[in-house]
Curated annotation (Swiss-Prot):
Belongs to the gamma-glutamyl phosphate reductase family. Pathway: Amino-acid biosynthesis; L-proline biosynthesis; L-glutamate 5-semialdehyde from L-glutamate: step 2/2. The keyword Amino-acid biosynthesis applies. Keywords: Amino-acid biosynthesis, Cytoplasm, NADP, Oxidoreductase, Proline biosynthesis. It catalyses: L-glutamate 5-semialdehyde + phosphate + NADP(+) = L-glutamyl 5-phosphate + NADPH + H(+). Gene3D superfamilies: Aldehyde Dehydrogenase, Chain A, domain 1, Aldehyde Dehydrogenase, Chain A, domain 2. This is Gamma-glutamyl phosphate reductase. It is found in: Cytoplasm. It comes from Haemophilus influenzae (strain ATCC 51907 / DSM 11121 / KW20 / Rd). The keyword Oxidoreductase applies.
């Protein structure tokens, strides 16, 4: 099954690589239109996934990731149209020149080929990844979690029908809809056809891919994100940043998980924060000093464990740690962070610069919410993933991250001396 799927994807990728930008945009436009026209059918299938998720006792955070609404579906269609508006990186000359030998040489962006994406309870990823891959001339094999089987099946049908309407091979976008985990293992070994594996999910999924894949893997997505409130920060403004970073959409990987507060302002700042977040149902997990302050402020708080400091909650749980100074904050991030998104709230330019220089993360923020780590927010369009590694791509992966390059060399029957 997967051998055939891989061959079909490879053949489709050859065709996609030859397409003009206009041809790719035409296909994307039809996909966006079909998402809107088929919305009742898509939402009906998604409702089946939601019902099964509730029956199986999945968490509210997972169900939120799984849920499609009319508004979210319209947002997905709009994201596809935004990808249309983005510059096509394929064929772009990165650099070049003429050598002493007279050989003209250029480095030109090209598609990667076939992308394999493994993800969990996020049906929106199906369209996000498909649209980015199509724009960059890549074929894609998608494997969503068993929680999304009904949603993914109908979304793939919509996309494949749109591709055929555009005169393109429907096998440019394929999905493994069988929930058998053995098929994931087979996909990870399909290096004859697949050029890159992009996992989107928890740490367990990323470890599985790293350990078993014979194909290059993009590692990332797990976000134990920190925000450090330094003593010179504007406390009233800082509270709103923390509120946004923690409560706007807790299930995302760019959500704040651990709040670090400088010791000298903790007794003043933390009660203000608790009061502000009182209606948000935030549950705090704190150490020693922070634990006592939060208890006195009437917060719903318990003692944090070492394991929880490394945990991506994906919920309204928030770790709180009081640190002595910026050095202690940076050391805590070094020990517990996942190199995703880290933020400092401060009025000191020198401390902000120190934080930027010393914190190793895909995205580092000064006086801003970590929630901005997103392809759309960064102006990249829908993202295929957020990479926390350093090779090939880092941070939100938009169009350019789905390309490679080739050296194009032109001569006048030139030979090397």
């Amino acid at each position: 099954m997967l051998e055939q799927m891989g061959k079909q994807a490879k053949d489709a990728a050859f065709i996609l690589a030859q397409l003009t930008t206009a041809e790719k945009n035409c296909a994307l436009s039809i996909i966006a239109e079909q998402l809107e026209q088929q919305a009742p059918l898509i939402l009906a299938e998604n409702a089946k996934d939601i019902e099964l998720a509730k029956q199986n006792g999945l968490s509210d955070a997972l169900i939120d990731r799984l849920l499609l609404t009319q508004e979210r579906l319209q947002g997905i269609a709009n994201d596809v149209r935004h990808v249309i508006s983005l510059a096509d990186p394929v064929g772009k000359i990165i650099d070049g020149g003429t050598l002493d030998s007279g050989l003209k040489i250029e480095r030109v962006r090209t598609p990667l080929g076939v992308i394999g994406t493994i993800y969990e309870a996020r049906p929106n990823v199906t369209i996000d990844v498909a649209s980015l891959c199509l724009k960059t001339g890549n074929a894609v094999i998608l494997r969503g979690g068993k929680e999304t089987q009904f949603s993914n099946k109908i979304l793939i049908e919509v996309v494949q029908n749109a591709l055929e309407q555009a005169g393109l091979p429907k096998f440019a976008v394929q999905a493994i809809t069988d929930p058998n985990r053995e098929l994931v293992m087979q996909l990870l070994k399909l290096d004859r056809y697949v050029d890159m594996i992009i996992p989107r999910g928890g740490s367990g999924l990323h470890e599985l891919c790293k350990q078993h894949s014979t194909i290059p893997v993009i590692v990332g997505g797990v976000g134990v994100c920190h925000t450090f409130v330094e003593k010179s920060a504007d406390q009233n403004k800082a509270i709103f940043v923390i509120d946004n970073a923690k409560t706007q959409r807790p299930s995302t990987c760019n959500t704040l998980e651990t709040l670090l507060v400088q010791h000298s302002i903790a007794e003043e700042f933390l009660p203000k924060l608790v009061s502000h977040l009182s209606a948000k149902n935030v549950k705090y997990h704190a150490k020693s000093t922070a634990l006592n302050i939060l208890k006195q402020a009437g917060a719903n708080v318990c003692e944090v464990t070492e394991k929880e400091l490394r945990k991506e909650w994906g919920s309204l749980d928030l770790n709180v740690v009081v640190v002595e100074d910026i050095h202690a904050a940076i050391e805590h991030i070094r020990q517990y962070g996942t190199q995703h998104s880290e933020s400092i709230l401060t009025s000191s330019q020198s401390l902000a610069r120190q934080f930027i220089n010393q914190v190793d993360a895909a995205a580092v923020y000064v006086n801003a919410s970590t929630r901005f780590t997103d392809g759309g927010q960064f102006g990249l369009g829908a993202e295929v993933a957020v990479s926390t590694q350093k090779l090939h791509a880092r941070g939100p992966m938009g169009l350019e991250a789905l390309t490679s390059y080739k050296w194009v060399c032109e001569g006048e029957y030139t030979v090397r001396k």
